[in-house]
Amino acid sequence: LIYCAISAFGQTGPMQGLPGYDPLMQAYSGIMSVTGNEGDAPVRVSVSLIDMGSGMWATMGILAALREVERTGQGMTVGASLLETGVGWMTVFVASHRATGTLPRKRGSAMAMTAPYELFQASDGWVFIAAGNDRLFVQVCKALDLEHLPADERFATNAQRVQHRTVLHVLIEERTRTLTAQE
């Protein structure tokens, strides 16, 4: 027999047994503090990522337990908590804070460590551009007829692009605003 328990705060500790739901755990784990735009109120992620993630972790635990039951013949207990899932989703922010001492901040759709990696206004909507490395940045610039940008020392490497993110965003968006999102 395998018993699986999913709870808000876990099966042990001072908060065991307390109720909790996805939005509460998004707030409690810090996810809402980094979601949205700088200066705006905290924002809940609109999908129930903590509920769904906890279900996935529980499923993985059950599958691992099945292997162990097959091997030993002994039943097992598996647990997952909504809080642990939320904190798990925050690992990049926690690691960054521990490495730099800087608190994470809201960045809208942008990724802190990569640029461009965010939404841009098109003539008829929005387009997400994700140039995750220098090679992809060159390809994006070519596709947008902005071949001169990779030669600009401000944008030659990802670190430089991150440093000059605001200027880069303006330059790319000047172009994307002339194109449809499909283009």
Language-model features and meaning:
Residues 115-183:
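Aromatic-enriched alpha-helical interface/lid elements that frame and gate functional surfaces
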Residues 1-127, 131-132:
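Active-site-adjacent "lid/gating" segments in soluble enzymes
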